[in-house]
Amino acid sequence: MTSTATYPTISNWLDNHRDELIQKSCYIFEHPETAYKEKLSSKCLADYLETQGFQIEWNTAGIETAFTAAWTNSDIDITKIQPAGKNVSSSNEVPIIGFLAEYDALPEIGHACGHNLPVSY
């Protein structure tokens, strides 16, 4: 996949899954969890992404509820991708796209901060 093909691939995936992502955002809104206690929220998202072919790795940065979800539409082993975007076993460049979402709620208020919204893009 070239970098010029990256945006349409991501955009199409988001468009095709828009309703499901909005449902996940609503679920998180309806089940507010404060920082570092987002067990239902993170499980909801990770389970969904896993059904979509993402590989889930828990305990990102030593945070129990944090996870990294990795996906590729090529034959590249994503476990061998280095931060510079080079595959260890070849010289092929691959795009690496990062997305960070916070979905912790405020104590006693819930999601007045809107942290559930990044889930729906």
Residue ranges of predicted features:
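Acidic/His- and Gly-rich active-site-bordering loop/insert found
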Residues: 2-120
